[in-house]
Amino acid sequence: MSLPTEPLSGMMVMIPVGGEARRLRPLTAESSKAVVRIFNRPLVEFALIELARQGIRNFVFGAKGYVNYRSLFDYFREGEGFSAQNKIWPRVHIKYQPRIEDVGSADSVRILMDYYNVRDQFLVVQGDNLFELDLRDMLTFQERTKAFMVVGLTPVEDVESYGVAETDESGRIRRFVEKPSRETAPSRMANSGIYLISPEIRSVFEEPEVRAMIAQNGRLDFGLDLIPYLAERGMVYGYYMKGSWLDVGTPRAYLSAVTRVLEDPSRRAAYLGEPLPQLRNVWIQGGSVDSVRRKEALVRKALSNRISLDGHVLIGRHCQIEDGTIIRDSCVDNFCILGREVTIERSAIMDRVVIGDGAIIQDSIVGRHVRVGSSLDSPTWVTGLSVVGDDVEIGRGATLAAAKVNPHRTVAEKADIQGQFVE
């Protein structure tokens, strides 16, 4: 991915990653939401690739707390491996927020600007969504409007879940209406969490009203605090994003994002690449000698109807799938072993999972290093938006429906868990 980098190579991108991401638990019980795997990669990696493709080479993670920092640093380090793996040259440089506790996403940006002496315009993106952004077009919009801050706006159907913008004819944001009803929403354009910001925001952080806001609320968040404050002063414009934007902040949103990418040809091309020529709408990853050998074995099984890969299916590297198994509209990550006559539908299976014979997994997420015990005479069911955390052992014949299981737990054989959180 050796592309022209001027003038964007000097621009810094800040990615606040704070909080405990409770809405995604148990997937985030022991790791940052930014590295939760989707399409067989850490979630935030797609943001880095999208921006690096356009010439960005400097990223800073505003990681709050040990779990967020450890998760991000252990995977990305300072960017050398990420750059090599994705063939990005010149390489990407990744920095981290020092151990200075912030009180919100905007406060994290304040800390990063001060610590890394940021004196130029910069971009802020989030670690829990997938997006396509024409950054040069956004910069052109900012230059035309002379906006102090530009907020990326994206169309949404479920306006009740987002902050929705009310703008004037010039694009200036009058206000955001938080989670309005469909009837009262001023528009369908929601805050994407993508911000292009003037370095002059340094002076805003020092204003008495902003300091009082922090003292009173114990918080300085973009959506709740800083953007409303700036919008009241006419300093914020809304940029209508032309590319896709997908929220991945809850298990339901996660599976919805998987479905929407798998079903949309343009999104599939961006996130999955080209499908196999022999199997329409099937992607099997891996380019090493052993990966190719296993890929070819799976293709032969599918072509001879020994396994069924229906709808749109993504399979990771070094997977083993036994006869009679059906995978439909789902993702299976690297190093997974699926037994005989397994059924996986509209689900996401993360890496290094073992699933026993006859198991049925529907509309659910199975975390990393999970063993689903199951047999043809005592099958296990995982259904109804169940979410299984990492390193869980599920006994044969168990039933999980709308259940959540924390990491490292054991679910007994023939257990019946309906709508419960196994903590």
Where do the PLM segments sit?
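A recurrent flexible, glycine/aromatic-enriched loop bordering the glycosyltransferase active site
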Residues: D158, S181-I194
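Alpha-helix/helix-capping structural signal
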Residues: G19, V67, R136, P199-E200, ...
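Conserved beta-loop-beta/alpha segment of the NTase-like Rossmann-fold superfamily
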Residues: R70-E169, L196, E206
